Amino acid sequence: MSLLTEVETYVLSIVPSGPLKAEIAQRLEDVFAGKNTDLEALTEWLKTRPILSPLTKGILGFVFTLTVPSERGLQRRRFVQNALNGNGDPNNMDRAVKLYRKLKREITFHGAKEIALSYSAGALASCMGLIYNRMGAVTTEVAFGLVCATCEQIADSQHRSHRQMVATTNPLIRHENRMVLASTTAKAMEQMAGSSEQAAEAMEVASQARQMVQAMRAIGTHPSSSAGLKDDLLENLQTYQKRMGVQMQRFK
């Protein structure tokens, strides 16, 4: 796996699924391929994206700044600086300075990542802030190692939280989660269907599913009534894709 592929993998792991994730993935690919060299336009686009947490925006802004060649005098963006200040916690800043001193002696991506993984996400973000604000300089490889370690820490806590929700025995939470997944799947079907004539059927199925979820929420239904909703939708989606000559078996 190449260095940039690894960075893209880690960064995308902390971005919530949805159309925005696909947009961010495309921009990362363009930046890494040298196709997008307007750092100011990129960061302005990033600043106005909804849904993303300030920290995720900060990490993405840091990655864009590391990768896109920019003029010496280009201003640092306030929203990135604020996100990478470790919540203003002096303990985070102290640890960030110690980590920075270690990273300065490191020259490899994997070496930097190993060192960084023993620090908290707050300290890692503060260390990124030091580098972003030009208070410290490390090689690009080392900075990417720091980025990936931060994303791994964040993704680990997101995964723990997700696992707790999936494993919950509370029928109301499970019911709502199934309806949310069905609704999200329906939205994805509508986007994938596009405007072709054959898409009408897929659009109809997706639309009916969303109406059903809205009705179930409006009138209140038994927690078991949502069982299989998403799977039924995915089956419909795969049938539609086969007819269109697309083979995608990895949705489930």
UniProtKB/Swiss-Prot annotation:
Any Gene Ontology CC annotation: virion membrane
GO function terms (MF aspect): RNA binding; structural constituent of virion
Keyword Acetylation: no
Localization, UniProt: Virion membrane; Host nucleus
GO biological process, one term: viral budding from plasma membrane
Motif Nuclear localization signal per UniProt: ranges: 101-105
Family as reported in the entry's similarity comment: Belongs to the influenza viruses Matrix protein M1 family.
Organism: Influenza A virus (strain A/Philippines/2/1982 H3N2)
InterPro entries: Flu_matrix_M1 (IPR036039), Flu_matrix_M1_C (IPR013188), Flu_matrix_M1_N (IPR001561), Flu_matrix_M1_N_sub1 (IPR015423), Flu_matrix_M1_N_sub2 (IPR015799), INFV_M1 (IPR037533)
Effect of mutating T43M: In strain: Isolate A/Philippines/2/82/BS
Lineage top rank: taxon: Viruses
Region (Membrane-binding): 1-164
Effect of A41V: In strain: Isolate A/Philippines/2/82/BS and Isolate mouse-adapted
SUPFAM superfamilies noted in UniProt: Influenza virus matrix protein M1
Reported function: Plays critical roles in virus replication, from virus entry and uncoating to assembly and budding of the virus particle. M1 binding to ribonucleocapsids (RNPs) in nucleus seems to inhibit viral transcription. Interaction of viral NEP with M1-RNP is thought to promote nuclear export of the complex, which is targeted to the virion assembly site at the apical plasma membrane in polarized epithelial cells. Interactions with NA and HA may bring M1, a non-raft-associated protein, into lipid rafts. Forms a continuous shell on the inner side of the lipid bilayer in virion, where it binds the RNP.
Protein name: Matrix protein 1
Membrane topology: Peripheral membrane protein
Keywords attached to this entry: Host nucleus, Membrane, RNA-binding, Viral matrix protein, Virion
Extra facts: Most abundant protein in virion. When expressed alone can form virus-like particles in transfected cells.
Renumbered residue ranges of the record's region RNP-binding: 165-252
UniProt effect for mutating A167T: In strain: Isolate A/Philippines/2/82/BS
Subunit structure as annotated in this protein's UniProt entry: Homodimer and homomultimer. Interacts with NEP. Binds ribonucleocapsid by both interacting with genomic RNA and NP protein. May interact with HA and NA. Cannot bind NP without genomic RNA.
